[in-house]
Amino acid sequence: MSTPAKPTSVESYKRLLSYAFKYKAYFIISFIGFGVFAAMEAQLINILEYFVDRLEGRPSAPVLGLSADVTSSLWFVPISVVVLSIIRGIGAYFGNFYMSLVGLNVITNLRRQIFSQMIYLPQSFYDTKNSGELISLLVYNIEQVTGSVTNAVKTLFRDGMSVAWFLAMMLIINWKLTLAFICVAPVLGGLMYIASKYFRKVSHKIQSAVGRVSHVATESIQGIKLVKSYGGEKYELDRFNDATNQNLHYGTKFERVSAFQTPVLHIVLALALAVTFYLIMILWDSDSSKAVVYATYAAAIAKPFRQLTKINSIIQKGLAAADTIFEVLDLQAEPNSGQQKLNAPKGRVELKDVHFGYNQDTPALNGISFAIEPGQTVALVGSSGSGKSTIVSLLLRFYDNQQGSITIDGTPIQSLELHNLREHIALVNQQTILFNDTIAANIAYGSEHIDEARIQDAAKQANAHDFIMALPNGYQTPAGEDGSRLSGGQRQRIAIARALYKNAPILILDEATSALDNESEKQIQSALDELKQGRTTLVIAHRLSTIENADTILVMDNGRIVEAGNHQTLLDRSGVYANLYHSQFS
């Protein structure tokens, strides 16, 4: 399959602008506001003509229906300056405010779109990304993109129209001098083109460095207990300093070129201005007031033009950020082509000759076949890396098997609508995840409607009700980030309560009691045994004592099932299972 051609800068920027142009009304108001601002800027300079005429005792020309007597009066210039400045301020307000509204809306909508995309991307995407990079994408990159649209457009509107007004007035006053003045435009354009390539290249590296900073910080903060207990503070500081130094290095390179580009452009502009002033002094043959106005326009044009030269670096930063954002937005969501839905399934699960590998060179499962009848419990045991958790991932379609079939009640899971499939499976794994929400919300997670009575029933079955009621606000107590306010055993019992609340016909327990002490495990085992009644249950266990009553125990090794039978049968064989069992109880 051929790789799609990388979009050009123009194509990328058009796509960026499409997000902003959804707010056309704001754009129009902003454009009008900046148009008024630029027009008043030009008229404030025009007032100089009347000022000089007054100083030299010459009558001023009539304007806007005002007679020469009015324009030559003592109060005309001061009053005009105040009135024009007020109108200019009003224009600037509307221009800036409504362009800011565009930026805020673009940031919000783009963040929502990228997060919505991330939520539905396949698990394989997260296997190759770290959380720091993705957080940086949501925060830093999106702000860079928005800046390249709104800030660049704002500068283009405000300063672009100022330059247009100034040049127009200069052409009206003396078109020959003005044409000579603008001959420097090709030189300025060439300098900006050269710089733009460098800006975009370095901006990519800056964003990568920011992602690494976020990644290191996220890892260190999430694992702060491990960091402290192992004395890893200095190591983490060194890692963070390395990441920030890399960011500083590329940021310095970017600013160095940006800082160098600006004075070079100013020097070129100053040379054009110097030539213009020289020509005015030797060639001007009309009123001195016109010469003053023309020279002021030529000098004043430098400021808005200087702002326009900064658009380049802003846009290049945004385009570099847009590359990473559009790369994620253009990814395919996890496959969900299934149309069938199971209503009240019995829960028969069958795997036939299932093969799967995370990469082509290393197969994780080789020809796995087994069936679990409704109400049965099947346990998977084996060493780490034998393929137990991979089977769980395939059942939930975090990945799709490459060969063979997986069915529920005879229906291939690829034929089922994804949400419907997962609706019928409750998972409790060894990595307990709790959200920074109330205990009740964590137990009822994924449900649109919270049933307080069902929550308490589930908590009681999971042996969690008593400790929850002892918390300051009971079920409304915040769990803290990742359940930080709870012990490991408490977090695991809430996770079990969550599975009980879901009341799905298929239950997966992936080391579900691994975080519990022996006493808590005994207390909860009876609840789990009751939960299993009438449900298809797949158990992955390290503690073999927890699966002695399983209907079938499958022993796995290197992606294959090497033994199968109940507890006593496998012990009598004196094979792999018996060795594992005796090693735990020796």
Curated annotation (Swiss-Prot):
It catalyses: ATP + H2O + lipid A-core oligosaccharideSide 1 = ADP + phosphate + lipid A-core oligosaccharideSide 2. GO terms for molecular function: ABC-type oligopeptide transporter activity; ATP binding; ATP hydrolysis activity; ATPase-coupled lipid transmembrane transporter activity. Keywords: ATP-binding, Cell inner membrane, Cell membrane, Lipid transport, Membrane, Nucleotide-binding, Translocase, Transmembrane, Transmembrane helix, Transport. The keyword Nucleotide-binding applies. It is an enzyme of class 7 (translocase). It is found in: Cell inner membrane. It comes from the Bacteria. Residues 28-317 form the ABC transmembrane type-1 domain. PANTHER family: ATP-BINDING CASSETTE SUB-FAMILY B MEMBER 10, MITOCHONDRIAL (PTHR43394:SF1), ATP-DEPENDENT PERMEASE MDL1, MITOCHONDRIAL (PTHR43394). Involved in lipopolysaccharide (LPS) biosynthesis. Translocates lipid A-core from the inner to the outer leaflet of the inner membrane. Transmembrane domains (TMD) form a pore in the inner membrane and the ATP-binding domain (NBD) is responsible for energy generation. In MsbA the ATP-binding domain (NBD) and the transmembrane domain (TMD) are fused. Belongs to the ABC transporter superfamily. Lipid exporter (TC 3.A.1.106) family. Homodimer. This is ATP-dependent lipid A-core flippase.
